[in-house]
Amino acid sequence: MTQHSRDTPQFYLTAPSPCPYLPDRSERKVFTHLVGEKAGELNDLLTHGGFRRSQSIAYRPACDQCRACVSVRVIADEFQLSRGARRVLARNADITGSLRAATPTSEQYSIFRAYLDQRHRHGGMADMTVLDYAMMVEDSHVETRIIEYRRRGADRVDNKRGDLVGVALTDVLSDGLSMVYSFFDPSEQNRSFGTFMILDHISRARQLGLPYVYLGYWIEGSRKMDYKGRFLPQQRLAPTGWLRVDADGETKHETTE
């Protein structure tokens, strides 16, 4: 095998399978492996083109006659908190997030297992074991971090950390943060914790001087994915490039990035 063939990504197409988001549709994905010294650069490039990462695989939808999955990224430094977002932050004022190495723990898995059992018991990840979870976190050749969200415990006499409430697995890209997967204690559902973690990532991107937070795929009409369209202004990937959607919901112009 030549050096050129090792460095050039090979792309593959999956067989059709039932769509997990829209009824009576099937999905196909195109994917490649993210390995080697240039995995980070390739992940950056592919993310800009609408790919997502899962372990050491980068993939994007390649469905026949369907383009419902739209890659979205929030424009972090222009994002303005709505009244609803401020209420979410207020409900989670007792929570602090800590950036850590991508190392799985049994505490994380307990929350992950409860989250799947409560909210995604029939999904494709429903049967994941603790070893599967460890692979999801550790099998990465790019810059990946874990953010643990805990109740504030700094004032406790025993100096122990507060209870773990949520976790985000996040890639650090050259131009933003990419939320690979996030989950939370389902008993805390009144906190709107998924929204809170996105708001926290927007704040972190600003602090790091990164322009975007990549949320994955927005799917209009899908209860599971439609919420991603609420974080405005954002950019949505169209066949002609990234399109800006302003806070009023109007598409204003096409970006050149």
Curated annotation (Swiss-Prot):
**Keywords, A to Z?**
Acyltransferase, Cytoplasm, Transferase
What is this protein's record name? Answer: Aspartate/glutamate leucyltransferase
- Tell me what organism the protein belongs to: Nitrobacter winogradskyi (strain ATCC 25391 / DSM 10237 / CIP 104748 / NCIMB 11846 / Nb-255)
Q: Where is the protein localized?
A: Cytoplasm
Q: Which Gene Ontology molecular function entries are recorded, alphabetically?
A: arginyl-tRNA--protein transferase activity; leucyl-tRNA--protein transferase activity
Pfam families to which the protein is assigned, alphabetical: ATE_C, ATE_N
One GO cellular component, as annotated: cytoplasm
Q: Which SUPFAM superfamilies match?
A: Acyl-CoA N-acyltransferases (Nat)
